[in-house]
């Protein structure tokens, strides 16, 4: 019976070790994705700033009536 309990304990410890490794791996992926998301957010903000500057500098559309009026 002691051998059976030891075998079960060893199996549980092995599963726990694999789960710890999986959690660590997933955490690393999440951190990488967070960094990528932050980088992309900064790039989008830069592009929005540039677009707003271009829109402010561009002449507005002419206000004319359509030809059918």
UniProtKB/Swiss-Prot annotation:
This is Protein SlyX homolog. It holds the Pfam family SlyX. InterPro entries: SlyX. The gene is slyX. Belongs to the SlyX family. HAMAP family: SlyX. The lineage of its organism: Bacteria, Pseudomonadati, Pseudomonadota, Alphaproteobacteria, Maricaulales.
